Every structure is written in C-alpha cells, then in structure tokens.
Amino acid sequence: MEFSTQTTASLHQIKTAALAVGVFADGVLSAAAEVIDRASHGAVAAVVKSEFRGRTGSTLVLRSLAGVSAQRVVLVGLGKQAEYNARAHASAEQAFAAACVAAQVGEGVSTLAGVAIEGVPVRARARSAAIAAGAAAYHYDATFGKANRDARPRLKKIVQVVDRAASAQAQLGLREGAAIAHGMELTRTLGNLPGNVCTPAYLGNTAKKLAREFKSLKVEVLERKQVEALGMGSFLSVARGSEEPLRFIVLRHAGKPAKKDKAGPVVLVGKGITFDAGGISLKPAATMDEMKYDMCGAASVLGTFRALAELELPLDVVGLIAACENLPSGKANKPGDVVTSMSGQTIEILNTDAEGRLVLCDALTYAERFKPAAVIDIATLTGACVVALGNVNSGLFSKDDALADALLAASRQSLDPAWRLPLDDAYQDQLKSNFADIANIGGPPAGAVTAACFLSRFTKAYPWAHLDIAGTAWRGGKDKGATGRPVPLLMQYLLDQAG
C-alpha cells in the first residue's frame, strides 16, 4: 500500500472516495470534523447529536454531503477526549481503513494522524496509522482453489492530512509504518500457509527471495550435512522424525552503522517448527491444525528482515532460523533419549513435545560466532505462557535489565505489548536430570519460566532476551489467523537502536 501526506485547510475541497474525520465520544468534533461540518451546513453535528456516539473504532459513512467534494465522509469514533491515546488512534485508523476495504474503494484520505496526542509525536502517529491500515487491508487467498478476486481489497493508497510543519516527520513515520506493515504481511502469510506448503525448504526459499529483492541482505541456507558438521545434535534429533528435510537459515542485514566504534550485530533467532504434532508425545487432535503456526517465530524474523531491508536501517542484524517438523516416526526422539547439543551439553528428552527449545538451543550456540551486542529469540514456546498472559502480552524473559527495558519500551511504543516474567536461578533446579546435564522439561509448575531457564543455559556469552509468543502470534476460533506479532515490537527496538 502507498502512503503520503497532504497539507491543506480546505478539507471540503479534497476529491477522494473516502475522507476520515474524528469524533469524540462526548460529541466533540475534531478540528477536521468541524471544517466538514461548516462546509456541510451542520450536517456532521446533526448526525453526531442524533445517532453517532463516537465510541472508539466505530464508523458512520455519510455519502454525498452538500458542500463537500469527497464521495464519502467517514466519521470515526475516537472515544472519550480525556482518554484519547495512541491505542485509540490506531483503532481509529484501522477502522477507517476497514471501512475503505468494505466499500471496495481504491484510495482514501485520513485526518486522524493530525489529532494531537500528548507525548506521541506525529512521526509515531503516522507510523501507527500505516501499520493499522496494512492490518486492515490484509487478505489471505494463497491456498484457495479459485481465489475470489472481487473479495481482494482494492485499497491501495491512503493520504494523511497534516500541518505543513509536521509533514516531513509524518512522511518519515509513514515510510517506517509501511515497511513494518509489509513485514507483518509476510509474517502473517507464512504463518497462515499450511504445513504441506510452508515447509523448512519453503522458509529457506523465502529468505533467498528476500535477498534477491533487497541488496542489503545476504542469506545462507544450511542443509543436513552442514548442520551435522556443526554438531547440532539437539536440532538434528527433532528433525530426524520427519521425512521433510531441515533447514538452518542465516540472514545478514549489513546496514552500515554510523557509529565508528560499532558493537557487534543484533541477532534475532526464530523457532521454525513448520508443523508440530508433538512427536511421540503426541498432541491432542482437536486443535492440532493450529500447530502450523509453530513457525511464527521464524516468520517474524523473516518479516522483520523484510522491513529492515526496505528501510535500509543503518544497523547490522543477523537472523538465525532453525526449521524442521516435529513428527512421530520410527526415527523420532523417544521420551528418555539423551542427545548432545552443539554446546556440548547433554539433554534428556522427557517430553518430545518440548521440541522448540531443542532446536533453539543449537541456534543460540551458533549465535556466539557473531560476537553479538544482543540476541533475541522469538518462539511459540509454551502453552504455559498463554495460561499466564493470555493473548494480549508476549512473555519477555531476560537477566539483562538494559535489554529488557529497551524491549519493554519498544513494546509500549509499538502497541505490541510484552510483559516481563521472572528468570530466577531457583527455577533451574526443576531442570535437573539423573542422566544428562539438563532435562528438557521442568514439570508443570512455571512451565514458561523453566523453558526460558533451559534456553538461558546456552546464552552465557552475550546479552540475551527470550520472547514467548505462543499467545500472541495467532488467533484461534472463527477469526483464526496469524497476527504478524511481534514484528512491530522488534522493528521499534531496532529503530531505537539505530537512533
């Protein structure tokens, strides 16, 4: 989608298929709504008084208003004026874009980013507007036998009306938001594809395709023999249960940092289990189809790299993806098996459905060779995190306060929330094994914490954080689908690091 800015006081003269103006819940019109109200001789105020309550994200379409050039004026609810904030703005922008999609219009004009929010500059508002519009316009039809082309959104362009003095910052924010939206689109589509299409090889080919599209990206895709040579015994033990060949994907964004005394790269590590049946510790059948989403950590890394490359962000970033399936077979891991990780630590596999940590631990060891400034792994790791935090916050674990604080700040600014959970050494006792250096599960109590504790055993060489996105990477039920999270959080963190 294309985004741009326009500066004009003559809103009523703008020729467009849809013009968005904000209305607060207490009946107060935004400045833009007042302009349209005057031009239409009080039509907006009359409608607001009689039938539009201005609830956050609600919309009402007014067609062919006298004195207004726009074909449609879309009243968008902003909620209570005293409570108007960044999240309410994002909801309003998404509601407007959704109204444009529903009306099958090709372009629209929004005045919503021009509504001031204390502590939220226009650049951040514009960025949020583009992300929200991208989310509203997302449409999946990749695996339909005969895609309904009429159902595809026609919305291709949104113009934000802002003050002339704010135009440059708004354009910067729109550019950032568009790149993030494109990254989220890729992440969502990869997640939504079925496991027989989005295989480890498919993820590897997607990475190669990105490298062909963007000059800043370099990609290397390792196969079984190369992984064996590296000694990734833990990763290999999971992969051998499936006929689908594994892939270990290494991406590099060479962003030419401005700092002369540059630190090492930021490394993003994604869990890429393209289908997780649980292995011999088989999952229940009822919702097993959703285990195609067990590669959403990998998908978020690829989406983040797409956004990074589009923005040409001046930062060195490495992406590592360990991709395979976790299936039961005669070659699959068995409960009680002991495997040797790339680090040399041995692992007793008490539950084969705790496989994500088995592939991540070798990727985290591989990350040491880059002498990273920080490593962040992203994984749909535990159902326990969903129990603890539901579908709102991603779980954040780190012993590095500076890294954790930076990620939490990014989560707040990007409206992609995370919540820090404990990583105390006392939990490590639950991972003791009588037959290996470490067990791969720690029993029912604090399952998300002990999973993070397991990973921490392989991260002693660098600052590290773990994002458990099991509750936030996709939605179930009638609205089933990938969300694209935590691409906004990751990109905001990287934007902050780039300065």
UniProtKB/Swiss-Prot annotation:
Catalysis performed (reactions): Release of an N-terminal amino acid, Xaa-|-Yaa-, in which Xaa is preferably Leu, but may be other amino acids including Pro although not Arg or Lys, and Yaa may be Pro. Amino acid amides and methyl esters are also readily hydrolyzed, but rates on arylamides are exceedingly low; Release of an N-terminal amino acid, preferentially leucine, but not glutamic or aspartic acids
Chain positions recorded as Mn(2+) 2 binding sites: 271, 276, 294, 355
EC top class named in words: hydrolase
UniProt binding sites for Mn(2+) 1: 276, 353, 355
Alphabetical UniProt keywords: Aminopeptidase, Cytoplasm, Hydrolase, Manganese, Metal-binding, Protease
Protein name (record): Probable cytosol aminopeptidase
GO BP field: proteolysis
Family (UniProt): Belongs to the peptidase M17 family.
Keyword Metal-binding: yes
Function: Presumably involved in the processing and regular turnover of intracellular proteins. Catalyzes the removal of unsubstituted N-terminal amino acids from various peptides.
UniProt keyword annotation of Nucleotidyltransferase present: no
Free-text remark on how the cofactor is bound: Binds 2 manganese ions per subunit.
Name of the gene this protein is made from: pepA
Record-listed E.C. numbers: 3.4.11.1, 3.4.11.10
InterPro entries (alphabetical): Leucine_aapep/pepB (IPR011356), Macro_dom-like (IPR043472), Peptidase_M17_C (IPR000819), Peptidase_M17_leu_NH2_pept (IPR023042), Peptidase_M17_N (IPR008283)
Organism name: Bordetella pertussis (strain Tohama I / ATCC BAA-589 / NCTC 13251)
